[in-house]
Amino acid sequence: MDNLTKVREYLKSYSRLDQAVGEIDEIEAQRDEKSNYELFQEDGVEEHTKPSYFQAADDSDTESEPEIEDNQGLYVPDPEAEQVEGFIQGPLDDYADEEVDVVFTSDWKQPELKSDEHGKTLRLTLPEGLSGEQKSQWLSTIKAVVQSAKYWNLAECTFEASREGVIMEERQMTPDVYKVTPVMNTHPSQSEAVSDVWSLSKTSMTFQPKKASLQPLTISLDELFSSRGEFISVGGNGRMSHKEAILLGLRYKKLYNQARVKYSL
């Protein structure tokens, strides 16, 4: 440690220090650079042969041949060229990069039904990523479903998904059958003869109670519908039987479940 300090002090007082440093730099610039392999040889390290990867590099420097390309522009290696040890030629990528559109959509929002002093409000969120035409088609579909409620009861429809879309079918309600004493208040022959069931709108139909304490239920189409147009708007048609039209009216007025419990419909 003392010797190093003495050297530093001596160099500070050495008047020709800059000249000596310049001479050293000049000598260093003129010195031949040697590879690590040559330095090992000078130090006496025994090296019999160069590794194969050095030999392959030397060959590539001395003999550079152009790459052979086939008609498709794919690189074909020269079979006579010496292969580097440990390297395995794998298949080259022979496909072109393709641009793939990636769309990140937001989370789907369920329909929201809210009620306030002004009534009920149903909010449907538009699906993400629709074009202008697809948006118009989606809105038209929702509008068509809403308007179809004029002609049938959507709550009574079956819902089935298919490859083409959705299939909704009217569910036929089968009335309960009970052993009761029939009351002949209508003439079957007359019902079958009419071409439009609405012609029997003023004709009453009677349903017997399930309990003796109740009075029979007597009702007509006029009591259930204000007009033939209203009857048609909820799914009625002239080919219905008188009883089917009455049951449709009970469902429309939301009286069917109450009547089914108390009377033999």
Curated annotation (Swiss-Prot):
Residues 1-60 are annotated as: Interaction with N(0). Residues 171-193 are annotated as: Hinge. Keywords: Chaperone, Host cytoplasm, Phosphoprotein, Viral RNA replication, Virion. Gene3D superfamilies: 6.10.140.830, Vesicular stomatitis virus phosphoprotein C-terminal domain. The keyword Methyltransferase does not apply. Disulfide bonds: none annotated. Residues 42-72 are annotated as: Disordered. Residues 49-105 are annotated as: Interaction with the L polymerase. It is found in: Virion; Host cytoplasm. GO terms for cellular component: host cell cytoplasm; virion component. The modification Phosphotyrosine is found at residue 14. The modification Phosphoserine is found at residues 60, 64, 226-227, 233. Residues 58-70 have a biased composition (Acidic residues). Residues 109-170 are annotated as: Oligomerization. Phosphorylated in the N-terminus by host CK2. Phosphorylation of the phosphoprotein is required for the transcriptional function of the P-L complex. GO terms for molecular function: RNA-directed RNA polymerase activity. The record marks 138, 141 as: Involved in oligomerization. InterPro entries: P-protein-C_vesiculovirus (IPR048220), Phosphoprotein_C_viral (IPR043036), Phosphoprotein_central (IPR037263). Homodimer. Interacts with the L polymerase; the association of P and L forms the polymerase complex and positions P optimally for encapsidation of newly synthesized genomes with the nucleoprotein. Interacts (via N-terminus) with N(0). Interacts (via C-terminus) with N in ribonucleocapsid (via C-terminus); this interaction allows to package the L polymerase in the virion and positions the polymerase on the template, since P acts as a bridge between N and L. The N-terminus is disordered and is involved in binding N(0). The region of interaction with the L polymerase is necessary for transcription. The hinge region is highly variable. The central domain is involved in oligomerization. The C-terminus is basic and essential for binding the N-RNA template. Nonenzymatic cofactor regulating the function and conformation of the RNA polymerase and part of the transcription and replication complex. Binds the viral ribonucleocapsid and positions the L polymerase on the template. Acts as a chaperone for newly synthesized free N protein, so-called N(0). Plays a role in virion assembly. Belongs to the vesiculovirus protein P family. This is Phosphoprotein. It comes from Vesicular stomatitis Indiana virus (strain 98COE North America) (VSIV). The gene is P.
